[in-house]
Curated annotation (Swiss-Prot):
It is found in: Cell membrane. One of its GO terms (biological process) is potassium ion transport. The lineage of its organism: Bacteria, Pseudomonadati, Planctomycetota, Planctomycetia, Pirellulales. NCBIfam families: YidE_YbjL_dupl. Residues 180-264, 265-349 form the RCK C-terminal domain. It is a multi-pass membrane protein. This is Uncharacterized transporter RB4869. GO terms for molecular function: monoatomic cation transmembrane transporter activity. Belongs to the AAE transporter (TC 2.A.81) family. It comes from Rhodopirellula baltica (strain DSM 10527 / NCIMB 13988 / SH1). Disulfide bonds: none annotated. Coiled coil: none annotated. The chain crosses the membrane at residues 4-22, 24-46, 56-75, 82-104, 134-156, 359-378, 382-401, 408-430, 445-467, 479-501, 511-533. GO terms for cellular component: plasma membrane. Keywords: Cell membrane, Membrane, Repeat, Transmembrane, Transmembrane helix, Transport.
Amino acid sequence: MNPILVLLCVIALGLLVGRVSFRGISLGTSAILFVALLAGHYGWTIPTGFGTLGLALFVYCVGISAGPTFFRGLASHGRAMAITGSVIVLTGVAVTWTSARLLGLPAELAGGLMAGAMTSTPALGAITQSSSDPAAVAVGFGVAYPIGIIAVVLFVQIAIKLFAKPGDSDGTDSASETSGQSSAEIAESNSIGRRVVRIANPVVSGKRPSDIVAFADSPCQMSRVQREGRWRPTPPDYQFEIGDDVMLVGGASEIRRVSETLGELQDTAEPVVDADRERRYVVVTSPEIYGRTLKELRLRSKYGVTIVRVQRHDVEFVPSARTRIEFGDGLVAVGEPDALAKIANAVGHRPRTVNETDLLSLVAGIVLGIFVGNLSLQIGEFSMSLGIAGGPLMVGLILGHFRRLGPIRGSYPPAAMLLMTEGGLALFLADAGLNAGANVVEVLMERGAMLCVAAAAIAIIPLLVGFAGSRYFGGRTLWQSLGATCGGMTSTPGLAVLTGATDSSQPATSYVAAYPVALVLITVAAPWLVELIG
C-alpha cells in the first residue's frame, strides 16, 4: 500500500477512535498511537522523517501556547501552584527511576512508562528522539497512558467524596494567591449565564459598579441596565439607584454572591437585548491593551463598554477587575454601537493581523529551535542537550512570551495554532506507533504485568504527594489542590471532572498555574532520566 495513504489512514482511524467516549473519558489524538501500534504489528510502514517534522512542529506550538503564562506564573502569585506541579513531576521521575531499578526495566521502556503515566505526549517525543530504542518508548507509553488517565480521574472523584464539605460545590472563592494571576477566572462556558438583580441595598445606592468590592473580587460583570422598559448597555457614569434592574453575567455562584451585596435576584423571563448592535467580538493585538488588568484599563469609563467574556485558548470565561488581558484574547464587549467601534480600534482588532499566519516566522522559529536543541553542554563525562523536542519547545516559550524576536513573530491565529499542534502530534504519534508495532506483542508478553504495576505506581504516587503537599503543607483549598494536581499531571480529563463538580473557578485557576511548568519540566527532564537509568 502507498506509504502516504497508510499514514493518512492511520491518522484518520486514530482520530475516530479518539472520539469514542466512556463516562466522559476519551483518548483524543493519542488514540492514533494505539491504532499505529496495531498497524505496525501487521507490517505497515511509512517513510522516515514524518515523525521528526511532526514532533518539532508540535512542541514548538506547545511552547508558543504556554509562553505567555509560563514565565508570568513563575514570577506571580501562581508560584505556589507551579511548585506543586514541579513536585509532582520530580516525584514521577523518582518513582520511575526506582521502578526501573527494582524491576530491571530498560531505560527506554521506563521513560515511555513515565510519559504515559503522566499523560505527557511532549515527554514521549523528547524521549523518542534522544533514545536508541524508540520502539520501546512507544510501547511503554501505550501501556501507561490509559492507566494515567484513569488514575487521575478516579483520584479526583475519590478526593471530592472524601474531603469535600457541604457547600464547597457552591464555589465561594476566597481571596487567594492565585486571584491576581492571568486566566484566574477561567470557568467552563456552559456554566456562564445571565440573571436580573433588583437593587435593594441602600449601602450601594449612589455608588458606581467599580466602587463595589464584590465586583473586584468576583468573575462577574454587570452588562446592562433597564431603562424605560429596554435593556441598555451600562453607561460610563452609571450609579446604582434603589429599584433599578441590572443584568449580571457570570457563573451561578458568582452571580448569587454579588447579588447578595446589590439586592434581590429576580425570577424573570430571559431578557430581550439587541445583541446584533450592542455586542461585538474583538481580538486583542494592541500592546497598549495586553499585559494590563481590566481595572487598569478602565474600559467602561473610557469607552463606555463592558467586557463580559474572554476567550483564551478555546476556553471562555467571565473576567473580574483583576483579570490580565493577553495578546490574542477574544473579548466579548457590550456597549452602544459607537462605543463598540472605538473599543475595536483601541484593542487593535485588525482582521488581517489577527487571522494571518506568518509561515516564514514559523519555519524560522522551528529552525532556530532545532539549532538550539543540537547544542550540547559537557559536564565531565555527561553530555546534555535539549534535542529535537526540547530546543523548539524552549524557543517557542521565549517567542510566546515576548511575541517577537527581531523579525520572527511568536503569535499565530488560534485556528492555525490548533491545526499545527494537532497535525504535528498526529504525524509524530503515527510514526512512533508504526515503528514500534513490530515489537509490541513481544514486549507485552514478556513484561506485561510488570509494566502495568510500574505504570500504576508512577501515576498514583505523584498524585498523592502533590495533593498532600498542596493541601496540608501549602495550606491550599481542596479545589486549588486538586486543580494544581491535575495540572502537574497534565491531565485535562481530571480537570473536566473538577469543573463538573463545582462552580468555583479555583480548579481551573490552579490548573493553569501548574500545567505549563509541569509540561516544560517533564519534557526537559524525561530524556535526561533515560540517560540516568541507562
